[in-house]
Curated annotation (Swiss-Prot):
Keywords: Cell membrane, Cell wall, Coiled coil, Membrane, S-layer, Secreted, Signal, Transmembrane, Transmembrane helix
Transmembrane segments: 373-393
A single GO cellular-component term on record: extracellular region
Domain characteristics, as noted in the entry: Composed of consecutive beta sandwich domains, a coiled-coil domain and a C-terminal transmembrane helix.
Record localization: Secreted, Cell wall, S-layer; Cell membrane
Keyword Nucleotide-binding found: no
Domain of life: Archaea
Family: Belongs to the Sulfolobales SlaB family.
Subunit structure: The mushroom-shaped unit cells of the Sulfolobales' S-layers may consist of three SlaB subunits and six SlaA subunits.
Protein name listed in UniProt: S-layer protein B
Functional description taken from the UniProt entry: S-layer small protein. May anchor the complex to the cell membrane.
Taxonomic path: Archaea, Thermoproteota, Thermoprotei, Sulfolobales, Sulfolobaceae
Organism of derivation: Saccharolobus solfataricus (strain ATCC 35092 / DSM 1617 / JCM 11322 / P2) (Sulfolobus solfataricus)
Length: 397
């Protein structure tokens, strides 16, 4: 009976508390906050805050902005939103708090400053939050392939292949196996030929992290490739808590990479051989065409040689005729020379004859004058005779 009364009392108290919490509100200006619902409400690092507020319904449909300020009053984030039909502003998981402990300020403002409200939240860490890194959540991949990794007694050992990109992933949890957001994870490695390399990141909201680094291949000669050691440390920090793990990574020869490289070379050679075969086939075709052309040319040369032979024969005949003509020419030249001499003599004789003709013409001219005088005298004498005869005849009659 006592147990039943106690249970009933506890239930009533729980219901009262739930009712109290569910109806808690905080008003600032003309903005009523339902989440956060209490000024200086506590939020843990890595947790998100949902903004649930109400402004006068007259501002329904207008734009609004949610501003979050760091403890030092600098702006951390500005989230635009819109007032719904009932005057509500609701943004689930609006912002996840990073590892910045202190009093944050959240303001809700309708565009134009017609409605403004402010509420403070206390961002802190859980009272006890030791960091542990569990083995089952630690993994390593290289070029998308999972690699061997082991975590025991604060030492991380793994085996990777050379000449690849390694991604190491894991989760950071607190003592209650809850994910920690905003924890810093740093990986420091001493890599041969590279030196000391430090990588750093922060965990996501689910406590996950990933770091990437390159594993060099010290030699490209297959017979000289051998394993080597990469040593270093992995440090996880969250608030005042820090834990460090030793890291030993054995980089073994990446024969798969070498084989792939050789396969690529073989593929390249095959491609080149195929191209050469194509070129050879083209050259053979060109050679066949050239042989055909050569055969045609040889046939044409044979024909030309035959024609040249005929031409040579013709030339020989013409040479003979030319010799004969040359002899005749020489003979004719001699005759022409002789004729030229005769013509010269004839020219001389002709000149003499021309002189004689000129003299004769002069003589003939003189004789012609005398002859014309004699003729005229004869005619006159004849006329006189005729007249005398006529006169005699008249007398007789």
């Amino acid at each position: 009976m006592v147990v039943k009364k106690t249970f009933v009392l506890s239930t009533l108290i729980l219901i009262s508390v739930v009712a109290l919490v569910s109806t808690a509100v905080y008003t600032s200006g003309n903005v009523t906050f339902y989440s956060p619902s209490v000024n200086n409400q506590i939020y843990y690092v890595g947790k998100s805050v949902t903004i649930d507020a109400v402004v006068p319904q007259q501002f329904a449909g207008q734009g609004a902005v949610i501003n979050l300020f760091f403890p030092n009053s600098t702006l951390a984030a500005s989230i635009p939103t819109t007032v719904n039909a009932t005057g509500g502003i609701y943004v689930p998981n609006a912002y996840t708090f990073p590892h910045v402990i202190g009093i944050w300020q959240i303001t809700v403002e309708v565009t134009g400053g017609v409605a403004v409200g402010t509420i403070d939240v206390n961002v802190t860490t859980p009272a006890v939050a030791p960091i542990i890194l569990t083995l089952q959540n630690l993994a390593m991949y290289e070029n998308t392939y999972p690699q061997f990794i082991e975590f025991a007694n604060g030492i991380i050992t793994s085996v990777v292949m050379q000449n690849g990109t390694v991604n190491i992933m894991g989760y950071v949890y607190n003592s209650t196996v809850g994910p920690l957001s905003g924890a810093t994870v740093s990986l420091t490695l001493n890599i041969p030929t590279v030196g000391t390399k430090t990588l750093s990141t922060t965990t996501a909201s689910n406590g996950s992290f990933m770091l990437s680094f390159q594993v060099p291949q010290l030699s490209t000669t297959l017979t000289l490739i051998s394993s080597y050691l990469i040593s270093g440390s992995l440090t996880v920090s969250y608030g005042v808590h820090t834990v460090t793990y030793n890291v030993f990574i054995t980089a073994i020869p990446n024969y798969l990479s070498v084989i792939n490289a050789l396969n690529n070379e073989v593929s390249t050679l095959r491609s080149e051989i195929s191209s050469l075969n194509s070129t050879i086939a083209s050259l053979n075709k060109s050679l066949a065409n050239a042989n055909t052309q050569i055969s045609n040319l040889q046939s044409e040369i044979t024909t030309l040689n035959s024609e040249i032979g005929k031409l040579n024969s013709t030339v020989g005949s013409l040479s003979t005729q030319l010799s004969s003509l040359s002899s005749q020419y020489n003979t004719l030249s001699s005759q022409v020379t002789a004729l030229n001499g005769k013509i010269s003599n004839l020219s001389t004789s002709l000149s003499t004859l021309n002189g004689e003709v000129a003299s004769l013409r002069s003589t003939v001219s003189s004789l012609t004058t005398i002859a014309y005088g004699g003729i005229i005298a004869g005619i006159i004498g004849l006329i006189v005779a005729i007249v005398a005869i006529v006169l005699v005849m008249r007398r007789i009659s």
